[in-house]
């Protein structure tokens, strides 16, 4: 039986990104209640500009390890991802809808029955990510299939696909009636960015070269910020700048993380959050909203305090539930990781 060694640096990156997701959900919930100053609004915008693209890049980074060695057929691979991603998507969506429906008197935006029925083609709120990720994998599998038959010896497939979907992102994103096509148009490029990062890091044996890549990313991004003020009124430039920011920050996070991995050990708790990120991703919205409601009813309206309590409190609650209940209960763990439980039974 072949065993694989987990990449602790990837777990660390995912752990950092989950914390950004929780912080992003905390700030997003406050935007409708308070007037953000420029600093807080800027923080929220920066978080939302890169944290989900970077998550998708992680999937591309890991996917590239198996490209060219796909022993399964395309339909078998898609079926496996449907079981591993779509099944949790449906189960979590139903549970989340039931919770929101039960608490409809306490929340600002109660859910309707139509939102539950439309899960197959219109995700509920933050669960768009799982829906989009499955479609992104499907496109990647189909692209592999086409290249394997038409251009089996072409060595720049990832570069070509990245450029292709970068163009699609600028020209087609938001123009489709079906939201799934918009997810593909807007985020497939980040998947292939992750594939390219894997390719680059494999070629950069010297860790100082990796650090120089990170420094270069920061310098390029800084020069772009200088130009933004003069060109921000141009919609095309705004889109270009947003995607460029996401790409640069993603490269920076990967480069710095892999550079640091050669000199220090990452915190175990952060690696744990990254390794089992699904429960934290799925649960944090509920607890962020719950803490916000409790603080409001207690008369605590200070925005900074709301942010701190929402972020720290929801992270702590998710961690406690994960340690005490989720990882010890096979049925609950199945909701988040169905394939893992199937393998355990075997």
List each model region and its residues.
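Membrane-cytosol interface segments of multi-pass membrane proteins
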Residues: 1-166, 264, 272, 297-346
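Juxtamembrane "helix-exit" motif on the non-cytosolic side of transmembrane helices
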Residues: 29-34, 102, 106, 170-177, ...
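Interfacial loop-to-helix transition and helix-capping segments at the boundaries
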Residues: 40-52, 117-132, 172-190, 224-252
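Cytoplasmic juxtamembrane interface segments
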Residues: 58-76, 178-184, 240-248, 257, ...
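Transmembrane alpha-helical segments
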Residues: 59-63, 135, 139-143, 189-201, ...
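Aromatic-enriched alpha-helical transmembrane segments of multi-pass intramembrane proteins
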Residues: 120, 143-237
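Alpha-helical transmembrane segments and terminal signal-anchor/GPI-anchor hydrophobic tails
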Residues: 184, 204-271, 286, 301
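Hydrophobic alpha-helical membrane segments
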Residues: 275-289
């Amino acid at each position: 039986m072949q065993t694989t060694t987990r990449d602790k640096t990837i777990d660390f990156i995912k752990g950092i990104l989950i914390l950004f997701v929780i912080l992003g959900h905390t700030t997003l919930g406050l935007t409708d209640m308070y007037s953000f100053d420029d600093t807080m609004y800027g923080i929220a915008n920066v978080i939302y500009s890169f944290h989900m693209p970077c998550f998708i890049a992680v999937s591309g980074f890991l996917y590239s390890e198996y490209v060219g060695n796909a022993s399964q057929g395309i339909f078998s691979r898609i079926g496996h991802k449907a079981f591993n991603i779509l099944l949790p998507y449906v189960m979590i969506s139903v549970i989340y809808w039931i919770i929101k429906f039960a608490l409809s008197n306490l929340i600002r935006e109660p859910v309707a029955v139509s939102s539950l029925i439309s899960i197959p083609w219109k995700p509920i709120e933050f669960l768009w990510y799982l829906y989009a990720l499955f479609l992104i994998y499907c496109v990647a599998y189909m692209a592999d299939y086409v290249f394997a038959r038409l251009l089996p010896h072409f060595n720049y497939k990832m570069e070509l696909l990245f450029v292709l979907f970068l163009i699609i992102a600028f020209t087609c994103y938001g123009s489709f009636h079906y939201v799934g096509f918009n997810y593909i148009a807007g985020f497939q490029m980040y998947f292939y960015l992750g594939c390219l990062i894997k390719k680059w890091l494999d070629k950069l044996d010297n860790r100082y070269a990796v650090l120089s890549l990170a420094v270069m990313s920061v310098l390029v991004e800084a020069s772009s910020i200088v130009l933004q003020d003069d060109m921000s009124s141009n919609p095309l430039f705004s889109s270009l700048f947003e995607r460029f920011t996401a790409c640069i920050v993603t490269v920076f996070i990967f480069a710095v993380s892999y550079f640091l991995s050669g000199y220090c050990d990452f915190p175990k708790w952060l690696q744990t959050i990254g390794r089992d990120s699904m429960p934290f991703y799925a649960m944090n919205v509920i607890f962020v909203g719950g803490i916000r409601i409790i603080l409001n009813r207690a008369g605590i309206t200070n925005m900074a305090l709301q942010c701190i309590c929402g972020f720290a409190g929801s992270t702590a609650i998710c961690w406690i539930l994960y340690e005490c209940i989720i990882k010890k209960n096979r049925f609950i763990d199945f909701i988040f990781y169905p394939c893992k439980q199937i393998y355990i039974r075997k």
